[in-house]
């Protein structure tokens, strides 16, 4: 969480992710004194006692923190603290939300958090600090649509956000969707509402994951599949060997006795007779990935092929592009979890359940429906080494999987590499930067590419048309935010803007990320701050040996080994007194 002015490595820049700050949140900084952590507000007053071993927005493992902090709106108003191996949560103003009591937890979801205490039982807290229920459970899911799946002993039930419980009496359960959920009792599946009342009697051998577009897939005692509506009426009577779990864009996939697949609409009308070897994706942008006798492609609802796309894996379209993959199976050791099944995580043909209940590492999703903290093992499992590519809705290749690597598509384009060189294409498939660069960093916010040539020199390119903004004559270029860039010439740094205008000569020993329009720079006399025009923001008498970027009008400064806080005029709002400081 620290935002120090230490120089970032190229690897760190490539891997960096940013959690957006909420300007409406109260300013809070973690401070360290005598080896213990607490927190202060924008006036320098202690709001969380300085008595904890660790303190931060998230104390999860580093590779889990991004998902933790992005789990829901308002998550960054909460601060986690740890003492003697147990953790809890406070608000930024210091109100206790969850007492220091748990060993492990879920992420916050729908304003609720699952925690496991020393007794190994799991309970839920709300953001207002109240327990959702006094009951404890052996396993739980995240909340989804106001209900969490809970397990006590060998049976499952539900817990509502208001503390109401649907008693754990079921063999298996699904998540609620639109107020209804499928449950299994005495070997048969039915549908209950949020009070636990059956709205569809348990008469089915199996069901789909959830209601979608008003329909739920059901399997009768003759092993035939169809769909029911919310009242339990068999709108599409069970007559198919298999069906897709859910409808998408008004269509579902069905398989007949010939083991061929076709499409139906929500009223059961066959729009494409069974003809495909498999249906690979749900409908998106009017197209569904299918496997034909001639290979893979994308089909329209009437079964006509829009275009062939003969890749190993097809995915749904998103924002006009579909990911495609080619790869081969290998075996490697990966971290895995125990397979606890309550029925989610299956599909028909090659169309797996696309209704994704995130997340890693807590909660459940496809193949891991119950949150069970702390149980991991390492074992060899089959995996797929794949090469990603992208195509558009006409089948045009935007980024070919023939490249050595194609990175995830961004809002403006796609980074790729081939033969040890990097390039970048826009979302229309036009090469803005050909694969000739030994290093390439993307800055979509400012619309530029930071590129490194064969001579190990860095330059700046426009993301719009690839024209050169800064010449390839620098040892390094770094994106500093707020439309500013640091360029390194010899052993000194200068500042340029996103149009390539040099705002300062190379005068500085180091530069750091800008915060609220002010840029930290280091000279032989220590750190100071520059305005966007490259002028000193304010004079200061003390020598700052380290600083943080500004946030909510304040920045941390280190003087003679101690940290304090200043405002944008350079005035101290908290004198230097602490061993360490992190703006949260």
Model segments located where?
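Bacterial N-terminal signal peptides that target proteins for export
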Residues: 1-7
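Residue-level detector of conserved, function-critical positions
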Residues: 22-584
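Bacterial N-terminal signal peptides
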Residues: 9-17
